[in-house]
């Protein structure tokens, strides 16, 4: 590109202390991305796949932010669109993004019609020993009493920068569940934002990550409660080691009129090593009295009693750390319905973390 694109990403809904420089991130992008279409496999007849420019794409706000839309505009392709056409829960789709070296942008739109369920699994892979970047934006709309389940694993090479974005809207009694494993990419900008518009709608996010080898993770997750008796849960579980860094922003926003709403945000971090950067901003915004919001974070090294227990069974400290770290990843990975995808995660993690030899 002749002029680099200056992007503001992962911006908090409300600024905190500016001197911390954690309210948002600024990225200079000087590439011209190529449109990348996923390979799509659909099981069952309750879903259709098309490619098109999506009307109303801009009306759904995403976690990484509107500046990321510009990469899709530069690439100029048509979004993959998945829509339900029946009321079956057995139908699911697997989308694979297998990148060579280079710079790419992709968009995916999910639409679950009234009383239907849409199940989608996404695999981001490739880029091993190659430099590049990938921008993947997913936006979802769940009509009344519809449910969307998204399972995403990011297994990119360490020389890749990944922009992994999500935005969703739920109508009355609708629900969105987002499960993500962020294991690759040297630099990751990930986020999600969901608007719970309808009464008794819900959102759940279960995010796992393992950052090492100088990886940098920058994340922003927001849920906005509009409707009465809406519920949300965001669970973030991760491991930091080998000079890695992580910035996580988690916001629960109770808007006027959402009486009876409940929101929970939890973060659990295992820190293996001393040269690490761990930053967290848990934020609760409230314009309504009759609501319940909770957030909590636990972080630190393995407890001495755990290490003692494992060492008494002949497991050295380094192996014990690998066992406990793997258990956190497995807890998220086990939520993914496709065995073949779970095996891809196991292969990516490698045999060095296998615990069979020590038990």
Each predicted region: which residue ranges?
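Small-residue helix-packing motif on alpha-helices
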Residues: 201, 320-321
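Long, low-complexity, mixed-charge
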Residues: 1-77
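Residue-level detector of solvent-exposed, low-hydrophobicity positions
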Residues: 24-26, 36, 42-43, 243, ...
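Small/polar glycine-rich anion-binding or flexible loop at a beta-alpha turn
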Residues: 303-306, 322-330
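Conserved beta-strand/loop scaffold segments within soluble protein domains that form the structured core
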Residues: 60-308, 312-313, 336-359
